[in-house]
Amino acid sequence: MAIFSVYVVNKAGGLIYQWDSYSPRAEAEKTFSYPLDLLLKLHDERVLVAFGQRDGIRVGHAVLAINGMDVNGKYTADGKEVLEYPGNSANYPVSIRFGRPRLTSNEKLMLASMFHSLFAIGSQLSPEQGSSGIEMLETDTFKLHCFQTLTGIKFVVLADPRQAGIDSLLRKIYEIYSDFALKNPFYSLEMPIRCELFDQNLKLALEVAEKAGTFGPGS
């Protein structure tokens, strides 16, 4: 069971809060000898696996770290180009960690705006008057759950398909937003949420939900 991401989108479609959990289960690390038996390529400023799927490493996975050093896009933390490593035998043996490409801040903003538009389209296309819009989208690897308040704020949770009690969790997040963001005298409505107590209570609620597998009343 796992909760992958939490997004809060304002009524204009702007992303005002996001939290991500990068699960080690979705990552694979392996030590390679020369020559590297994977084909890596640069795509959208990320180094991805193009060929050589094996041992939990999938085509489309991104290089996340080399020899324990985090990779940011196409560069390591010390400024070296990732694609320079495979062709130099002096760099071997080399330990590489792979995983799903992580979204950039701009991509998250774009996806929030896109979901806001799809939500509105879904509401308009519904044959029922007063449609609530998109409440859940399901894939083979995750479910997207959405709860929209009367004021148009959307709370979105991406979770493992087997995770139970997400509807209750969404309403708990709304309570936390009301208590620790809206009641904060320094918070401006519709603006990005930067409140320490909101962060702390949200993380606590997510931990409880993950451990229990459900999030019932009174939690």
UniProtKB/Swiss-Prot annotation:
GO terms for cellular component: dendrite; endoplasmic reticulum; Golgi membrane; Golgi stack; postsynaptic density membrane; presynaptic active zone; synapse; synaptic vesicle. CDD domains: TRAPPC4_synbindin. Its main location: membrane. Keywords: Cell membrane, Endoplasmic reticulum, ER-Golgi transport, Golgi apparatus, Membrane, Postsynaptic cell membrane, Synapse, Transport. InterPro entries: Longin-like_dom_sf (IPR011012), TRAPPC (IPR007233). GO terms for biological process: autophagy; dendrite development; endoplasmic reticulum to Golgi vesicle-mediated transport. It is found in: Postsynaptic cell membrane; Golgi apparatus membrane; Endoplasmic reticulum; Vesicle. Gene3D superfamilies: 3.30.450.70. Core component of the TRAPP complexes which has a function of guanine nucleotide exchange factor activity for Rab1 GTPase. Plays a role in vesicular transport from endoplasmic reticulum to Golgi and autophagy. May play a role in dendrite postsynaptic membrane trafficking. Belongs to the TRAPP small subunits family. TRAPPC4 subfamily. PANTHER family: TRAFFICKING PROTEIN PARTICLE COMPLEX SUBUNIT, TRAFFICKING PROTEIN PARTICLE COMPLEX SUBUNIT 4. Component of the multisubunit TRAPP (transport protein particle) complex, which includes at least TRAPPC2, TRAPPC2L, TRAPPC3, TRAPPC3L, TRAPPC4, TRAPPC5, TRAPPC8, TRAPPC9, TRAPPC10, TRAPPC11 and TRAPPC12. Interacts with SDC2. This is Trafficking protein particle complex subunit 4. It comes from Rattus norvegicus. The gene is Trappc4.
